[in-house]
Amino acid sequence: MATSGRLLCLCLVLGLIFESLGHPVMGEKRAGENASPSARSLPKRLGNVEAPCGNQTCQFGCCEDDVCRELNCEHVDFPNY
């Protein structure tokens, strides 16, 4: 019984030592690893969203009085695919 107790204590101490050294016992997943492939490729499929506005084109914004607005836009028109 004393041998099994010593072995248990040794395992616990070794576990604490390796944990303090930064060696993880189990690999941790990062946030993006659980996302589906279709969700990861969504920004690539959208591409650049540009809207004509006066003499220029607005990218990721809206056009008000021939000026591109990035903030306080009520809606953004996406092109039809």
From Swiss-Prot:
Q: Output the Gene Ontology cellular-component terms.
A: extracellular region
One GO MF term on file is:
toxin activity
The propeptide segment or segments lie at 22-45
Q: Which domain of life is it from?
A: Eukaryota
User: Which positions make up the signal peptide?
Assistant: 1-21
Kindly list the places in or outside the cell where this protein is found, as annotated in its UniProt entry: Secreted
PTM text: Contains 3 disulfide bonds.
Report, as the record phrases it, the tissue specificity of this protein: Expressed by the venom duct.
Q: List S-S links within the chain.
A: none
Assigned keywords, A-Z: Cleavage on pair of basic residues, Disulfide bond, Secreted, Signal, Toxin
Q: What is known of its domains?
A: The cysteine framework is VI/VII (C-C-CC-C-C).
Identify its protein family. Belongs to the teretoxin M (TM) superfamily.
Protein name stated in the entry: Teretoxin Tsu6.8
Q: What is the lineage of its organism?
A: Eukaryota, Metazoa, Spiralia, Lophotrochozoa, Mollusca
